[in-house]
């Protein structure tokens, strides 16, 4: 009895979720990424399209910016900015109806990611005009990773002193040997 050699299955890419399908119907280009560990849809967008896509998602019911942040993929790799949007008004409306079924209780949420080169000064448009809650979150991301948010009304450090050199959460950050302490106010 001879067995025919089997070829290993080719791993399929992520399946487009409801938000990705909606963005495709609206004509928005985006990159489909693997969902997170909770099954939340994750979508990659180009920095120049960020404001337009966020505005479209807000018009489609994603009315709450749950969080915005950044991370460093490692030395020589990209910096990533992420935005987690939730359809909060829909969730509250479902709670008011009293429908406790698992499908009705499911919150519509999506995470957008923007991948940035660490060369020069990484920048992308601020979404402060769409979500006021982005104010301190974008400032913290600037402060820790050096990502500039164009159009932000308060583009200054949030946690570190204004004269601090470097971006402390970048993986290529070199910690200074000496800190000059200033007097308490």
From Swiss-Prot:
Molecular function in Gene Ontology: NADH dehydrogenase (ubiquinone) activity; quinone binding
Localization of this protein: Cellular thylakoid membrane
The UniProt record lists the keyword Transmembrane helix: no
GO cellular-component term (any): plasma membrane-derived thylakoid membrane
Family matches, as InterPro entries: NADH_DH_suC, NADH_quin_OxRdtase_su_C/D-like, NADH_UbQ_OxRdtase_30kDa_su, NADH_UbQ_OxRdtase_CS
EC number: 7.1.1.-
Keywords: Membrane, NAD, NADP, Plastoquinone, Quinone, Thylakoid, Translocase, Transport
Membrane-topology annotation of the record: Peripheral membrane protein
Keyword Translocase: yes
One of the protein's GO biological processes: photosynthesis, light reaction
Any Pfam family matching the protein: Complex1_30kDa
Tree of life domain: Bacteria
Catalytic activity: a plastoquinone + NADH + (n+1) H(+)(in) = a plastoquinol + NAD(+) + n H(+)(out); a plastoquinone + NADPH + (n+1) H(+)(in) = a plastoquinol + NADP(+) + n H(+)(out)
Protein purpose: NDH-1 shuttles electrons from an unknown electron donor, via FMN and iron-sulfur (Fe-S) centers, to quinones in the respiratory and/or the photosynthetic chain. The immediate electron acceptor for the enzyme in this species is believed to be plastoquinone. Couples the redox reaction to proton translocation, and thus conserves the redox energy in a proton gradient. Cyanobacterial NDH-1 also plays a role in inorganic carbon-concentration.
Record text on subunit structure and interactions: NDH-1 can be composed of about 15 different subunits; different subcomplexes with different compositions have been identified which probably have different functions.
Family from the record: Belongs to the complex I 30 kDa subunit family.
PANTHER family, sorted: NADH DEHYDROGENASE [UBIQUINONE] IRON-SULFUR PROTEIN 3, MITOCHONDRIAL (PTHR10884:SF14), NADH DEHYDROGENASE UBIQUINONE IRON-SULFUR PROTEIN 3 (PTHR10884)
Protein name: NAD(P)H-quinone oxidoreductase subunit J
Lineage, opening ranks: Bacteria, Bacillati, Cyanobacteriota, Cyanophyceae, Synechococcales
Gene (UniProt): ndhJ
